[in-house]
C-alpha cells in the first residue's frame, strides 16, 4: 500500500495532497498542469516535499518531521516516463539489465523469461532503441522497470507520446502488467479512456489538490471531453 501526505511550493503553484493507493492499479487523473507529475516525482524521490510523509508497503520513504528522505536509488520504485528514456547506445538486452545491475541484483533467469514473454520482447533483444517503434520502446521501458524488482511502479503518461495505433498496440501489455506482474501501479494520465481500462481506484487531482477519490465512475464522459 502507498500512503502519501505531502505539501510542496513550486513558485506560485502549491501542492497539498493526501491519498492512499491500495489496489493493483490506482490512477492519478486530472488536467495538464494539475500537479500529477510533481506528485509522483515526490514519491520517486526526484523532488523533496516541503512537508509531509510517504510510505510504501509500510516502509518510510519520506518524513519531514523525522528528517527521513530515502534517496531515489534506494526506494525500489520503477518509473516509466512518457518517452521511455532508453539508452540509445545499448541493446535492448542491456537496457533491460540496467535497473537490475544498478541495484546489484543477480539475474533471475525465470523472472527474465517471464517478463520478456509477457511483454513479447524476445525478438527485440539484439536491437538498439533507435530501430524500435514508439510502442516497442515503451514495452522495453516497462520491462526494465519490472526487472529491478520494484515495490511500486509509477507510470507517467506512458502513452502520451504515441499515436493512436501505437496506443492501441501497447494498452493490452499494460493490462497484462496489471494482472500478471504482481507489482502495484500508480498510473498518471489526463485521458479517461486509458484509465477506464487500467485503474480500480481513481484519485482526481486539480490545481494541486485531491478533489475526489473513488472508482472508475469518476471518469465520466464529461471528464473525457473536458480533459482529453
What spans do the regions from the language model cover?
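Conserved ABC ATPase signature
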Residues: 128-132, 136-138
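A short, proline-enriched helix->beta-strand linker immediately N-terminal to the Walker B motif
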Residues: 147-151
Amino acid at each position: 500500500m502507498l500512503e502519501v501526505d505531502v505539501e510542496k511550493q513550486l513558485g506560485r503553484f502549491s501542492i497539498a495532497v493526501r491519498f492512499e493507493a491500495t489496489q493493483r492499479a490506482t490512477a492519478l487523473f486530472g488536467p495538464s498542469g494539475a500537479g500529477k507529475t510533481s506528485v509522483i516525482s515526490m514519491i520517486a524521490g526526484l523532488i523533496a516535499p516541503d512537508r509531509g510523509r510517504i510510505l510504501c508497503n509500510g516502509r518510510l520513504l519520506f518524513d519531514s518531521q523525522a528528517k527521513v528522505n530515502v534517496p531515489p536509488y534506494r526506494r525500489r520504485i520503477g518509473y516509466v516516463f512518457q518517452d521511455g528514456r532508453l539508452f540509445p547506445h545499448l541493446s535492448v538486452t542491456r537496457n533491460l539489465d540496467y535497473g537490475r545491475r544498478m541495484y546489484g541484483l543477480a539475474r533471475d533467469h525465470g523472472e527474465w523469461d517471464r517478463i520478456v514473454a509477457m511483454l513479447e520482447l524476445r525478438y527485440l533483444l539484439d536491437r538498439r532503441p533507435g530501430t524500435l517503434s514508439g510502442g516497442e520502446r515503451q514495452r522495453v521501458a516497462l520491462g526494465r522497470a519490472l526487472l529491478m524488482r520494484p515495490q511500486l511502479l509509477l507510470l507517467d503518461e506512458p502513452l502520451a507520446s504515441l499515436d493512436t495505433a501505437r496506443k492501441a498496440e501497447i494498452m493490452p501489455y499494460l493490462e497484462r502488467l496489471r494482472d500478471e506482474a504482481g507489482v502495484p501501479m500508480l498510473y498518471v494520465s489526463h485521458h479517461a479512456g486509458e484509465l477506464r481500462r487500467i485503474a480500480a481506484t481513481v484519485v482526481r487531482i486539480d490545481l494541486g489538490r485531491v478533489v475526489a477519490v473513488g472508482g472508475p465512475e469518476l471518469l465520466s464522459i464529461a471528464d473525457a471531453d473536458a480533459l482529453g
